[in-house]
Amino acid sequence: MEKAKRVVWRLLAASVCVMAVSQAVHADSLDEQRSRYAQIKQAWDNKQMDTVQALMPTLKDYPLYPYLEYRQITDDLMNQPTVTVNNFIQANPTLPPARNLQSRFVNELARREDWRGLLAFSPEKPNTTEAQCNYYYAKWATGQQEEAWAGAKELWLTGKNQPNACDSLFGAWRASGKQDPLSYLERIRLAMKAGNTRLVTALAGQMPSDYQTISTAVISLANDPNSVLTFARSTGATDFTRQMAAVAFASVARDDVENARLMIPQLVQAQQLNEEQTQELRDIVAWRLMGTDVTDEQARWRDDAIMRSNSTSLVERRVRMALGTGDRRGLNTWLARLPMEAKEKDEWRYWQADLLLERGRDDDAKDRKSTRLNSSH
């Protein structure tokens, strides 16, 4: 029995030793791999590609090996076959730098003008704007025009500059006769709203000759928003001219709110604005008159404008202003002006209850506060 016990203990001791040695070897192995990984990166940076090629196969089990593979693929992307890129993406779907590889390779296939190969590689729309433009151009090049023009329109309608790769798609769309001139007007409006004067000027200059009058007026307005009254009086009133005038008006209000306030009646007359369009201008000015430095006339005008407004955020801003100045009467007035949905917010429930307590309506105040507490659980 004692002999058997001694044998068991020897076996256990041997097992522990083997495990310790194994772990030490594994630790050494990881240290060596880490060292070789650093060697490869340095050799790569120094363009010592023979060293890179010799050491890379020894790191296939190292956790960071996919990063080396990614660099190997992208350093020579123009010569990579589709299957290599596809296999890498499928094998490393969560690798952070690999997430943009699909879009990069779509652009590479576009450079090769391999339109069918591009669509086979990326059956779905890629992520980046440049790749999307190449994707929809490939649709056009392979006869799928309806999809191509739908994609072109989606990419066109932005106030931002688009990548050069989009020029081919937009050019094909324009040449097909399928691009509505109104899409120019809509993009000009978006560019104007984004403050992209250069794009406004470029787009206006590309418009058909029968749009020359409005094109010239738009360029002048983009370069000098303060000329908005001249623009409003010299162009026929359309939805487009009204929208452009509103965007320019917002710019005027930022620089000179009083000038903008006094300008509203003239813009209303020149562009035949309805009540909703007029209120949009009032709202723009009212937002700019929330400080303590306004005149009595401006304050009365502002409150009248807010009283007519359908903008919940503007009315809420006025409530906060009343709170900030300790204006209890104003607080009551503007809380009452909030739509029912906004009144149910915890913030406004509290102040409604506070006002009820002040007026001696304790039960109503408790109901409001208890509802607020219950809704917060």
Q: Could you describe each region identified by the protein language model?
A:
Residues 21-71, 220:
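N-terminal leader/linker segments that initiate helical-solenoid repeat arrays
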Residues 39, 69-72, 105, 135, ...:
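Structural register within alpha-helical repeat arrays
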Residues 42, 71, 75, 108, ...:
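Residue-level signature for tetratricopeptide repeat
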Residues 49-52, 81, 85, 98, ...:
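Solenoid-repeat scaffolds in large eukaryotic assemblies
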Residues 51-150:
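Post-signal peptide N-terminal segment of secreted/secretory-pathway proteins
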Residues 72-74, 89-90, 102-107, 282-293, ...:
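Alpha-helical adaptor scaffolds
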Residues 367-376:
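Conserved small/polar residues in nucleotide/adenosyl-binding loops
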